[in-house]
Swiss-Prot record:
Belongs to the RimP family. Signal peptide: none annotated. The gene is rimP. One of its GO terms (cellular component) is cytosol. The keyword Cell inner membrane does not apply. PANTHER family: RIBOSOME MATURATION FACTOR RIMP (PTHR33867:SF1). Keywords: Cytoplasm, Ribosome biogenesis. One of its GO terms (biological process) is translation. This is Ribosome maturation factor RimP. Required for maturation of 30S ribosomal subunits.
């Protein structure tokens, strides 16, 4: 995580904790000429627009005080949505038995992408059952090789 994102997280996390919300992710991204600071929050049952607005207002106030980002940016606060990213240990543990999408930094057994059910997670290895054509295959993916992971919608 970059130094700027660490500073932003230090500002945001006490706010989300105070409001009994989970800080899911923070992203600082450039799109075209504009920069966006995106904060994703959640709680059991999901968050509503009023909770997003409350976090946005409090974060904006604190960011103006400490000013860790020097350039102009747009602040966005939202739910992570149905395809929530899996980043923290707890995210992976909560995703066991759910449908997930995982990509790796390098090929593992000839693959860099898996989409299937997360059967287990022991802190170091993800075990995913995928369907390859008509047969089910169980794959083991070392956590340190995972580039990105998220919940997925199964069609």
């Amino acid at each position: 995580m970059s130094k700027v994102l660490e500073q932003v997280e230090a500002i945001v996390e006490p706010i989300t904790n105070e409001l009994q919300l989970e800080l899911v992710d923070i992203a600082f991204e450039k799109e075209g000429p504009n920069w966006f600071l995106r904060i994703f929050i959640d709680k059991d049952g999901g968050v509503d627009i009023d909770e997003c607005a409350a976090v946005s207002e409090k974060v904006s106030e604190k960011m103006d005080e400490s000013d860790p980002i020097t350039q102009n940016y747009f602040l966005e606060v939202s739910s992570p949505g149905a395809e929530r990213p899996l980043k923290k240990e707890q995210d992976f543990e909560n995703a066991v038995s759910k449908y997930v999408h995982v990509t790796s930094y390098e090929p593992i057994d000839g693959r860099k992408m898996w989409e299937g059910t997360l059967v287990s997670y022991d802190g170091t290895t993800l075990v995913i059952t995928i369907t390859d054509k008509t047969r089910k295959i169980t794959c083991e993916i070392p956590k340190d090789k995972v580039a990105k992971a998220r919940l997925a919608i199964q069609f």
